[in-house]
A protein has these predicted regions:
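Conserved alpha-helical segments that form or flank metal/cofactor-binding pockets of metalloenzymes
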Residues: 44-73
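Residue-level recognition of alpha-helical structural elements
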Residues: 13, 20, 43, 109-113
Length: 134
């Protein structure tokens, strides 16, 4: 999962919806791994809630997109998971995901899809806030 290249692709208008969803699915796997590895119960709970809600919101986003544009096809590939090191690394990864969604939102013209992206960004912001609590 390479957030920097993903952001570059979004900004250069080369990322399509399928790639956004693939990135989100990869991120979800990484998030679940962080959830299992964190030594903090509060972070464990926050990351579990983030994973579950992100999965639900992504499902709705894909279904809405497919209602407009037809079924998507996500490229196959491998997912490389990174071990949990500290909460700041998790926060940075969430900030990268937020940036990807905000950039993608700017390039689409569907209000309903933009609203669903706003919900995902709101979830990310809430999770970052909770993870920063001591």
């Amino acid at each position: 999962m390479d957030g920097i290249n993903t952001i570059v692709n979004i900004r250069s208008n080369t990322m399509n919806f399928e790639q956004l969803i693939r990135y989100t699915l990869e991120y979800g796997n990484q998030l679940r791994y962080y959830h299992w590895q964190t030594p903090s119960y509060a972070q464990h709970e926050a990351l579990g809630e983030f994973y579950n809600k992100l999965s639900e919101l992504t499902d709705g986003l894909v279904e809405s997109w497919q209602g407009r544009r037809g079924n998507i096809t996500v490229d196959q590939g491998s997912v490389e998971l990174v071990d949990y090191t500290d909460v700041e690394t998790v926060i940075e990864s969430a900030e990268s995901l937020r940036e990807v969604y905000e950039a993608f939102k700017e390039k689409i013209g569907y209000g309903d899809i933009q609203n669903q992206i706003d919900e995902i960004v709101e979830l990310i912001n809430h999770t970052i806030y909770v993870l920063r609590l001591k």
